[in-house]
């Protein structure tokens, strides 16, 4: 008998890591109000997702293991890029209540909806040469960049709407390769570094 535990595979280590980093980001933001740590963890999760496909392809896998890996990646992305930013950003300081809170949660829903819509799109459409709309790891790095400053809870809906639109917009972005890919990775590493320095000093 095949059980879910049999589908645990080392090729998915970076995907599991992204999930763990996202949970840690929630814990640091909600329990400790530490947004430098949350920003570092979000950037690290984005980097883990960026490299998880390359990492997985280094292993010899059966067709089932490849299919499980693809499903796992999509499910984890929904948590890491759809749910985690909402929970982290809701922990930001700011007076709640009234119409503003309704607007906040409506925009959060729109953002989460755009996230899962994008994931569903890429579960069906496979394109190794380009992205349609802004990829979610880049959105996570935008959130991490925002957390470099004392962001107010009240301006988050504007960023939610902008990021949601960017994820599902019908414009084409070539998949970064070479120098472009290195620049993207450097953005993520730089964010982790800056946030960690803020934590120390």
Predicted features and spans:
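Short, amphipathic, aromatic/basic-enriched membrane-interface segments that mark the entry/exit
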Residues: 3-13, 69-72, 124-132, 154, ...
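Multi-pass membrane catalytic core of lipid/isoprenoid biosynthesis enzymes
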Residues: 11-16, 58-117
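C-terminal ends of transmembrane helices
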Residues: 2-3, 54-66, 114-128, 165-175
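C-terminal membrane-associated helical module and adjoining short loops/tails
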Residues: 127-201
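Structural signal for membrane-spanning alpha-helices in multi-pass inner-membrane proteins
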Residues: 22-29, 85-91, 115-121, 143-147, ...
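Topogenic membrane-insertion module of multi-pass membrane proteins
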Residues: 1-53, 169-171, 175-190, 194-201
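Structural signature of hydrophobic alpha-helical transmembrane segments
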Residues: 39-50, 98-112, 151-161
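Core segments of transmembrane alpha-helices
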Residues: 17-24, 77-88, 111, 134-144, ...
């Amino acid at each position: 008998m095949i059980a879910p535990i049999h589908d645990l595979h080392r090729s998915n280590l970076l995907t599991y890591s992204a999930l763990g980093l996202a949970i840690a980001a929630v814990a640091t933001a909600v329990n400790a109000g530490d947004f430098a740590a949350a920003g570092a963890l979000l950037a690290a999760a984005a980097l883990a997702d960026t490299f998880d496909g390359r990492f997985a392809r280094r292993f010899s896998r059966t067709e089932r293991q490849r299919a499980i890996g693809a499903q796992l990646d999509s499910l984890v992305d929904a948590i890491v890029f759809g749910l985690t930013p909402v929970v982290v950003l809701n922990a930001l300081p700011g007076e709640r209540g009234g119409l503003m809170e309704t607007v906040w949660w409506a925009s959060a829903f729109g953002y989460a909806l755009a996230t899962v819509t994008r994931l569903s799109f890429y579960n069906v459409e496979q394109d190794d040469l380009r992205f349609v709309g802004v990829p979610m790891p880049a959105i996570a790095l935008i959130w991490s960049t925002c957390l470099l400053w004392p962001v107010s809870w009240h301006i988050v809906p504007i960023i939610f709407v902008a990021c949601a639109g960017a994820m599902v917009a019908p414009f084409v972005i070539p998949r970064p390769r070479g120098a472009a890919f290195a620049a993207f990775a450097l953005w993520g590493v730089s964010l982790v570094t800056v946030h960690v320095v803020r934590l120390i000093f």
